Every structure is written in structure tokens, then in C-alpha cells.
Amino acid sequence: MKVLIDDKIPYIRSAAQWLLGDVDYLPGHAFGDSRQLAEADALIIRTRTHCDEALLANAHRLRFIATATIGHDHIDADYLRRRGIAWTNCPGCNAASVAQYVRNSIVKTSFSLLENREQRTENSLENREERSIHAPLTVGIVGYGHVGRAVRRAVEAMGCRVLLNDPPLEEAIRTQLRRSSISYLTPEESPSVEGVLPPEGEIEGASPSTTFVTLQEIAEQSDVITFHTPLTTGGSHPTLHLADSAFFASLRRRPVIINAARGGVVDEQALLCAHRDGLVGPMVIDTWEGEPNINSHLLREAFIATPHIAGYSADGKSCATRMALRAVCRHFGIPIDDEAQFLALTAPPSLPPEVQPSGRWADDALTLYDPLLDTARLKASPATFEQQRGTYPLRRETFE
């Protein structure tokens, strides 16, 4: 069996050689120029490789593609289905990294938040021995997939109250419950979901006890609003400009706005107007409309501005590599006989020995990742957005 692998996928070479044997590496853009493609049984790729008929017409042996990414817009699923080629992506591989970004951004904006609520006291983040940032902020999470769930865990650990909004997921849960001929009057009346709902992943985060609120409630009650939806233009719940001028006009608490979803989920012109009108507090922008040619006015006014790197941690890349390799092994019936060896071969690099936790959670969080450092680089050189993203030094999520 021959496997072709994108040569920019980190932490994969030793494990791939150990598990798969006959492995070749190519730049993502060079797969179409390679005679090796005709001999490949499997590909492990990134978004740079567009898997469609133009690329794969002569790949007669190909049976499986794993993309070591969450996104799969570069996969022509209909064509692969017609060809009988199986494929997978790596959903949730960088969810913890995005959650780290959101949590640390909240830490950096917390003093402004406390001023908004007139609760900046000695018990706030100035006393970093405290576990919670104060009693408590309300964080509205829009989009409750893998990333939204990771964000919820991260901010609840800080002592925050959480509001959830995800109409498609809420409808999917209701539909599944109707099919099961079971209805619940309140979350408290809900029995165990075992045997009622499909396993997590078929309906992400599905549980009849999950409480959702409307976007209007998010707008009225939240101190922080963070977006984690895909960008969609059709269907009953399109997300293009989900946060528009009407949404910003309904805000009540001058919240922090965080967009680490997709550029276009937030209407940037409406956001700028709302910020200038005092409706919005600090702005945290990682995903931009028109990338890499980003809005210079928004860049200037954003408190945190980064080049679409919220998910760029070494831990997340390691997770994607592991998921992709496991998928190939599962598809071809290749056993992973030594799990400890597999994890060791795909592990991200350790931090320098001088980088040690202090025991003060906020300090430790910012030691691992301070988003203002990335902000300074982007504001100094916005024209190098794509270069900064492509050469980003992968951060660690933990001290381990």
C-alpha cells in the first residue's frame, strides 16, 4: 500500500513510517504534478490540495483520503462518492485551541468588562489567585458544535455563566425527539438520553437537557458574545452577517464581541458603527471578511486582532495528525499495536524547561498564549497577513 502525505503536516513522519511503511511526501500544491498519485492507495492532505476530478482522474488505485483539517471545502464529496473513494476530515481537532484563544482574550479584556459593570474590585483579575474572573460574567456562545462546546468548558472553568444559541442544533434535537415519540416539558423532566438520541457526533452536543436561548437573549444578557458558527448563505438559518446592524442595536451591556468563526458571520461595517456608537465594547477579531485583504479600520479599532490563527496550536495540529492516521489505519485494517508509541511519535514538542507554571491560572494562561503579541504583529504589518498565518509559531495549550 502506498500513501502520499502533504509534507507540511506536522508530527506525522515517524508515526506514518512506523504504521504505513510505503510513504511519500509532497508539497500540497504538487499532488497533481506527481506520477506517484496514480500509484497511491491513500492521501493525507491539507486544504491546499483540492481533491476533485481534475486532480484524481488518473488516480485509479485511490481508495481513501484523510484531510488533517476541520474544513473540507477542498473535497469534492460528490465526485468521490461516484468514484467509491472514502474520505474523512478531523472535526474538532483544534477546538481546544480556539477555546484557549477565547478564554485568553476574555482575560485580556476583563478590566474593560469590569468597568462596564462597575465591579472592578480587588477580587477581580487583579487578584490572580482567584479562580474566577469575578462574580460572574455572562458569555453568549453562538454556535454549539465542537468549538462551542470547548469554549463553554473553558469559560465555565473561569466562573462564567453561559448562554447557548444554535437554532439548527436545537431543531435537530427536537426532530430526533419527535422521531423517538418522546417529548419533555422541561429539562428537569428529561430522563437519560441513552437509547433516545444518536451518539454524539451524529447530532453534535445533542441532549434534551441542553438549554438554548434566542439570539435576542444573547444580545440582551451577555457581557461577552463569541461566534463559532460555519458561514452559510442558504437554508433556514443562514449565518452570513448573522451579527448585523439590527443585532448590534439590540445589545444592552456593551459586550466584548469575538469572531473566531468565519469572516462574514459578523457584518464588519455594522460592527464598526456599533463600536463607534458605544454599543460594543472591546472587539476581538480572528476571522475577517475578504481575507487576506482585511478591513484596515476594523484592524485599527480592534482590541485584539489576529491573522486567523485561533486554532493554530501545536496540540491541535498533533490531534489532527493522530485523527488522520487513525482514520487511514481503520479504513485499511491496520492495527495500532502500541498506543503509547503512537502517542509519543505524534506528540508536539515540549516547552523549554524554563517555562513552568506559576500556579496562578491567569498568569499561566497568558504565559502559554498572549493574544496581544499576535495583535501587535498584525497591526504593524497587515499586508503580511497570509505570511504571518503561514509561518505562525505553533503555541502549546498546556505545560505538559
What residue ranges belong to the model's regions?
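N-terminal glycine-/charge-rich "phosphate-binding" loop or analogous flexible N-terminal tail
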Residues: 1-40
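NAD(P)-binding Rossmann-fold cofactor-contacting core
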Residues: 30, 158-177
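Phosphate/diphosphate ligand-binding glycine-rich loop within oxidoreductases
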Residues: 42-116
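Rossmann-like adenosine-cofactor binding region
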Residues: 51, 171-176, 180-187, 208-296
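Phosphate-coordination loops involved in phosphoryl transfer and adenosine-cofactor binding
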Residues: 62, 135-138, 254
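Phosphate-binding beta-alpha-beta segment of Rossmann-like dinucleotide-binding domains, i.e.
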Residues: 85-153
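Intrinsic disorder/low-complexity segments
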Residues: 114-135, 174-211
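Rossmann-like dinucleotide-binding domain for NAD(H)/NADP(H)
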Residues: 254-400
